[in-house]
């Protein structure tokens, strides 16, 4: 018998990686503002409560809009993003074993559309970029399910599917995964970027292949 019924994943740093360990927001802010200092400043403002998550998204996307960003420019900027080794095989094997799969992430939909267009996920919670008929960026629908909201998303999926929360698992890597890791019945810190996540997760898994999580999901 499976120990869990649902496994949800973060994306940036968990399923998708960059050679310099950048996430998609850092890449696009640097591309369209010419500097990476805005990332650190807004992150600090968010963590200190000076801005909300929705305001953080609006500020970043506002800069991209001011720069006249287009779909093709965004795709060119993120071309160095790659799937973590073993993603396709691992997800396929988890499905074969009967697990429901989901994404709960602060990433952008264009990342999944580009790198995992035929993904196996039953539920996908992330930020959605909006383009006009000429493929110019016109806005973004900010997910209400990042950081603390990730735990709420997990509860919503579990309730809808009739799955007890203790039979839900989560795999992530960063500060915004801490609360959902606490909420889940089982959590894995995959190549964690912060000590707090390592401390709250049931197990830490390190390596370049997602298949390393499979022994924990028989």
Identify the residue ranges that each predicted region occupies.
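Surface-exposed amphipathic alpha-helices with a cationic face
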Residues: 88-96, 150-151, 155-162, 182
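Short, acidic loop-to-helix structural element flanking the phosphoryl-transfer center
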Residues: 72-110
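Acidic, Mg2+-coordinating phosphoryl-transfer loop and its flanking beta/alpha structural elements
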Residues: 105, 165-207
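Glycine-rich phosphate-binding "P-loop"
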Residues: 68-81, 138-145
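Substrate-recognition "cap/lid" segment bordering the active-site pocket of phosphatases
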Residues: 113-168
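Active-site neighborhood of HAD-like aspartate-dependent phosphohydrolases
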Residues: 1-51, 58-62
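Phosphate- and divalent-cation-binding pockets in alpha/beta enzyme and binding domains
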Residues: 24-27, 86, 110-114, 179-180, ...
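Short acidic-hydrophobic, aromatic-tinged amphipathic segments that line or gate anion-handling sites
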Residues: 125, 203-208, 212
């Amino acid at each position: 018998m499976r120990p869990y019924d649902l496994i949800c994943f973060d994306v940036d740093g968990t399923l998708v990686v960059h050679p310099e360990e950048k996430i998609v927001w850092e890449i696009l802010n640097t591309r369209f503002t010419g500097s990476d200092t805005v990332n650190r400043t807004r992150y600090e403002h968010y963590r200190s409560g000076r801005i909300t998550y929705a305001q953080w998204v609006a500020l970043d996307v506002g800069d991209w809009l001011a720069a006249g960003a287009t779909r093709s420019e965004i795709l060119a900027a993120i071309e160095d993003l790659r799937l973590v080794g073993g993603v396709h095989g691992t997800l396929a094997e988890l499905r074969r074993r009967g697990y429901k799969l989901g994404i709960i992430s602060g990433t952008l939909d264009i990342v999944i559309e580009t790198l995992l267009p035929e993904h196996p996920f039953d539920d996908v919670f992330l930020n959605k970029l909006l383009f006009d008929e000429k493929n110019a960026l016109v806005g973004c629908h900010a997910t209400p399910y990042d950081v603390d909201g990730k735990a709420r998303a997990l509860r919503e999926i579990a309730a809808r599917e009739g799955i007890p929360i203790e039979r839900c698992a989560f795999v992530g890597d960063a500060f915004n995964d801490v609360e959902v890791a606490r909420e889940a019945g089982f959590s894995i810190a995959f190549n964690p970027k912060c000590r707090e996540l390592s401390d709250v997760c049931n197990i830490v898994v390190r390596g370049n292949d997602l298949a390393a999580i499979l022994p924990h999901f028989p």
